[in-house]
Swiss-Prot record:
PROSITE patterns attached to this UniProt entry: PGM_PMM
Protein name: Phosphoglucosamine mutase
Phosphoserine sites (modified residues): S102
Origin: domain of life: Bacteria
Signal peptide: none
Post-translational modification: Activated by phosphorylation.
Organism of provenance: Aliivibrio fischeri (strain MJ11)
EC number of this enzyme: 5.4.2.10
Record's function text: Catalyzes the conversion of glucosamine-6-phosphate to glucosamine-1-phosphate.
InterPro entries: A-D-PHexomutase_a/b/a-I, A-D-PHexomutase_a/b/a-I/II/III, A-D-PHexomutase_a/b/a-II, A-D-PHexomutase_a/b/a-III, A-D-PHexomutase_C, A-D-PHexomutase_C_sf, A-D-PHexomutase_CS, Alpha-D-phosphohexomutase_SF
List of catalytic residues: S102 (phosphoserine intermediate)
Length: 445
C-alpha cells in the first residue's frame, strides 16, 4: 500500500493554523472526502466536534468542502466521538466526521472519519481520499450543492443509548460518583446519563470555554478527580478525555484505575455471568499484571500494536468482544463499534453494583507490575530508534530484566515523541532502567 501523506493513526491532526490544520486544507479535505463518499451511497454525513475554540472554524471549512461535493452535512455540535459513530449508524449516513484532537491541548485539532457502520474508515477509503486531495478542487453545479442542518436531538438520542447498555435490573441509587468531563465533549452528556440512572453526582471539568479542554482535568490528568473523590467521600470517580473515547477511574481511596484494570473487571464479570466470548485484546503497552491475571482466570489474551485501530483489528481477527489500551480506550463490540468511555464506565459500575464490591475490591484480583513510561520529544528527520547507542541501552536493560519484565520503544502516532516503556517487578530498578534508555534517546536526537 502507498505511504500515507496526510492521514495518521487517528485521522488528520496537528497544530491549528499550521498545515494540515488550516481552513483551506480542511475545506479541501471535506471536498475530497465528499468526492469519495458520494460514490458509495447516500450523500449524508454526520459531523460532531469537541469543545475547542477552533472547532467552529474547522466546522465551517468542512461544511464548505462537503457542500461543494454535493453532500448534506448534519451537525451535532459538541458531541463525544463514540456518539458520532453511533449517530452515523442510526441516521444511516454515509460517514461520520469528528473534529477533535482527543486528549491533546486546545491548540491542536484534527479530523477523523467513521464509516457508515460506525467504524474507522478502511485503509483503502483513506487512501482514496488522499488521492482526491492531490487533485484540483471542483464544484458541483448550483442545483446539486449540499445543504447543512443541525441535529437538535443528537444528545438525547445518545444519552438514551448509553443508558440502554446498563442492566435494567440494576440502579445507581445510593452511589456517590464524581464525574470529570475534561471540559470536553461529554460535559452535557455524562452527568445526565449517571444522574438519570439514579446516582448522586458531583462534577468537575464541565465548564468548557474553548481553551480549557484537557487542562489539568480529564483522563490524562486525574489529580483533581483523585482529590475530589477523597474530599467528597465518593464511592469512586470517572474521568473522560476531551472527546469521550478514553476513560480512567479512581477508587474510593483516590487510587487510579486505568484501561487495563477496567478491561480486566469487565472481562471477569462477563466470565462470571457466563457471557464472555473469547478473550481480551491488549496492546504492547498493556501491563503484564493484566496478562497474568487473565491467565489465572483461564481467559485468553493477545497483544496488538498500540492504537485503538489495531486493537479493533485483533478483535475482529479473533472474533472477540473486549479490547483495551491502558490509556483508557476500551472497546466492547457487543455494545459499541468504537471506544466509548461512558459505556465502558457503565459496565464497570454494573459489576460494582451486581457484585456488591467496591471498585478497589474488584481491582484487587489484578496485581499491576511497576511500569514506567518516559516520553522524549525529538525533532528533525533522524530516527532515534535506529541509533546504535539506543539499541545498546535497550539490549542492556532487557538482559538485566530477563523474563521478569519488558522494554518497549516506539514512536507516537500523533506527536513527535519517542515513548520509552520499561516494566518489571522492582519499581526502583524499572525507573532507573527507563531513564537509562531515555537518556540514550535524548543524546541521539
Amino acid at each position: 500500500m502507498a505511504e500515507r501523506k496526510y492521514f495518521g493513526t487517528d485521522g488528520v491532526r496537528g497544530l491549528v493554523g499550521q498545515a494540515p490544520i488550516t481552513p483551506d486544507f480542511v475545506m479541501k479535505l471535506g471536498w475530497a472526502a465528499g468526492q469519495v463518499l458520494a460514490k458509495q451511497g447516500t450523500k449524508k454525513v454526520i459531523i460532531g466536534k469537541d469543545t475547542r475554540i477552533s472547532g467552529y472554524m474547522l466546522e465551517s471549512a468542512l461544511e464548505a468542502g462537503l457542500a461543494a461535493a454535493g453532500l448534506q452535512a448534519k451537525f451535532t455540535g459538541p458531541m463525544p466521538t463514540p456518539a458520532v459513530a453511533y449517530l452515523t449508524q442510526t441516521f444511516r449516513a454515509e460517514a461520520g466526521i469528528v473534529i477533535s484532537a482527543s486528549h491533546n491541548p486546545y491548540y491542536d485539532n484534527g479530523i477523523k472519519f467513521f464509516s457508515s457502520e460506525g467504524t474507522k474508515l478502511p485503509d483503502d477509503v483513506e487512501m482514496a481520499i488522499e488521492a482526491e486531495l492531490d487533485k484540483p478542487m471542483t464544484c458541483v453545479e448550483s442545483a446539486l450543492l449540499g445543504k447543512a442542518s443541525r441535529l437538535n436531538d443528537a444528545a438525547g438520542r445518545y444519552i438514551e443509548f448509553c443508558k440502554s447498555t446498563f442492566p435494567k435490573e440494576l440502579s445507581l441509587a445510593g452511589l456517590k460518583i464524581v464525574i470529570d468531563c475534561a471540559n470536553g465533549a461529554t460535559y452535557h452528556i455524562a452527568p445526565n446519563v449517571f444522574k438519570e440512572l439514579g446516582a448522586e453526582i458531583i462534577t468537575i471539568g464541565c465548564e468548557p470555554n474553548g481553551t480549557n479542554i484537557n487542562h489539568e482535568v480529564g483522563a490524562t490528568d486525574v489529580r483533581a478527580l483523585q482529590a475530589k473523590v477523597v474530599e467528597e467521600k465518593a464511592d469512586f470517580g470517572v474521568a473522560f478525555d476531551g472527546d469521550g473515547d478514553r476513560i480512567i477511574m479512581v477508587d474510593e481511596f483516590g487510587e487510579k484505575v486505568d484501561g487495563d484494570q477496567i478491561a480486566y473487571i469487565i472481562a471477569r464479570d462477563a466470565l462470571r455471568r457466563g457471557e464472555l466470548k473469547g478473550g481480551v485484546v491488549g496492546t504492547l503497552m498493556t501491563n503484564m499484571g493484566m496478562e497474568v491475571a487473565l491467565r489465572n482466570l483461564g481467559i485468553p489474551f493477545v497483544r496488538s500494536d498500540v492504537g485503538d485501530r489495531y486493537v479493533m483489528e485483533k478483535l475482529l481477527e479473533n472474533n472477540w468482544l473486549i479490547g483495551a489500551e491502558n490509556s483508557g480506550h476500551v472497546i466492547l463490540l457487543d455494545k459499541v463499534t468504537t471506544g466509548d468511555a461512558i459505556v465502558a464506565a457503565l459496565q464497570v459500575i454494573a459489576s460494582i453494583v451486581g457484585s456488591k464490591m467496591s471498585l478497589k475490591e474488584l481491582c484487587d484480583g489484578m496485581s499491576m507490575f511497576p511500569q514506567i513510561l518516559v516520553n522524549v520529544r525529538f525533532a528533525g528527520d533522524n530516527d532515534p530508534l535506529e541509533s546504535e547507542a539506543v539499541k545498546a541501552a535497550q539490549a542492556d536493560v532487557e538482559a538485566k530484566l530477563g523474563d521478569n519484565g519488558r522494554v518497549l520503544l516506539r514512536k507516537s502516532g500523533t506527536e513527535p515523541l519517542i515513548r520509552v516503556m520499561v516494566e518489571g517487578e522492582d519499581a526502583e530498578l524499572v525507573t532507573q532502567y527507563a531513564q537509562q534508555i531515555a537518556d540514550a534517546v535524548k543524546e541521539s536526537c
